[in-house]
Amino acid sequence: FFSSRRRHTRYPLVTGVQTCALPICYDVIVLDAFSGGSVPVHLLTREAFEVYAAHLKPDGFLVVHVTNAYLNLYPVVMRQAESLGMGVRSRFQEKDPERFTRENIYMILTRDQKYLQSFPSVDPPIRDAAGRVIGARALDIPGVGLWTDHFSSITPLEWRE
């Protein structure tokens, strides 16, 4: 954040969760607040996603880094995309100890049909005992309700150990 200010970049970096902090309209909004131990639920509600969508250009992208130490947040974001009529593509990044990266899952929400038709999802692989890819792991879970400012439940979510 501070280094981008020193470099006088031409791309504004908006921090904070205040909805009034977001000017209209962005090409891309990135949510990256879920990789720790706690989940800021207020950022995953219908009302929050309506604000994000209102500040996107019609063909804009909402990128959500859903990697979390304990919970599979993919179905929560999927329900939000469905409620907004947005398409979803997922991007999985395998861990790479040499590059000091860990496994990450990103969800890209958009109404841009050209993008949705051109780029398939990249989901986490399922590997056999020899390490060969034999399929892709499904990330969505049926039965997870739409989170709102008045309702959210982690009970149906997949827990990680």
Regions flagged by a language model, labelled:
Residues 35-44:
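Glycine/threonine-rich flexible loop motifs
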Residues 35-36, 67-71:
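Short "lid" loop at the C-terminus of a central beta-strand within the Rossmann-like core
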Residues 23-30:
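A short acidic, Gly/Pro-enriched loop at the edge of an enzyme's catalytic core
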Residues 30-31, 64:
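Redox-cofactor binding/interface segments in oxidoreductases and associated redox assembly factors
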Residues 1-20:
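Single conserved hydrophobic/aromatic residue that forms the stacking wall/gate
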Residues 21-23, 39, 75, 79, ...:
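Soluble small-group transferase modules, centered on the S-adenosyl donor enzyme superfamily
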Residues 44-58:
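A short glycine-rich, Lys/Arg-flanked "PGG" loop and its adjoining helix->strand segment in the class I
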Residues 59-66:
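Conserved beta-strand signature within the Rossmann-like core of class I S-adenosyl-L-methionine
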